[in-house]
């Protein structure tokens, strides 16, 4: 494996060809389970109840910095979802190997540890489809990474990870709000939209516009004004 970690599938690379993946960087990693099966748990309201496999994966994520030559890796935050995981991590100093080397080891450890589990049910007693008769990968071959390069991205991604179960629960409860609508017309304009389209017809509507020239004090004041207006029925 090269430092550029060019993993290709059907001509598409999942890695940044210009990036040395052994260098210090902050990454948001996403790994899907094999065939996107819900092996790692289930969503109960707005929380994830981990399966036996999910608990192993959660433990193994925390163990990544203890792998050989991996002490420069710091796990900031992670979330285990039923069929995928998000891991926010930082490489503090140059690694002996590209990041993909450690991800491959992580996947191998998950497979080895989970192969010893034979149909252990969910903690809450729910049904499980986790029976296996032979070793099989828990995760798919590929993983996706997002390289964080701008100020504020770390806090934003940390919130994104933390909010993942709530967003999934919302999508399941109101799938219509997350469906992309084509050719929505407002007066003489046509656009693509997603969300509660009925709000666009609400009588109390305001346009929210902010400039980069605003000071933090002005931004805070605008925020308080908008929250007050929204609480009183205004749609932005």
Residue ranges and their predicted role:
Residues 1-236:
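Short catalytic/metal-binding and nucleic-acid-binding patches
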């Amino acid at each position: 494996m090269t430092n550029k970690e060019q993993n290709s599938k059907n001509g598409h690379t999942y890695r940044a060809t210009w990036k040395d993946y052994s260098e210090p960087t902050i990454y948001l990693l996403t790994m899907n389970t094999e065939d996107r099966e819900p092996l790692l748990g289930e969503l109960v309201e707005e929380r994830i109840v981990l399966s036996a496999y999910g608990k192993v994966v959660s433990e193994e994520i925390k163990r990544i910095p203890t792998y050989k030559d991996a002490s420069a890796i710091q796990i900031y935050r992670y979330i285990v979802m039923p069929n995928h995981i998000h891991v926010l991590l930082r490489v503090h100093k140059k690694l002996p190997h590209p990041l993909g080397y450690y991800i491959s080891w992580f996947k191998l450890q998950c497979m080895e540890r989970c192969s010893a589990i034979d149909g252990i049910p969910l903690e809450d007693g729910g049904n499980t489809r986790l029976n296996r008769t032979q070793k099989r990968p828990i995760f798919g071959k590929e993983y996706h990474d997002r390289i964080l390069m701008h100020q504020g991205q770390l806090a934003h991604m940390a919130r994104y990870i933390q909010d993942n179960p709530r967003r999934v629960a919302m999508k399941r409860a109101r799938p219509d709000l997350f469906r992309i609508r084509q050719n929505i017309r407002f007066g003489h304009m046509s656009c693509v939209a997603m969300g509660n389209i009925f709000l666009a017809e609400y009588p109390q509507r305001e346009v929210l516009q902010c400039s980069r020239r605003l000071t933090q004090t002005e931004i805070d004041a605008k925020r308080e004004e908008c929250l007050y207006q929204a609480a009183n029925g205004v749609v932005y």
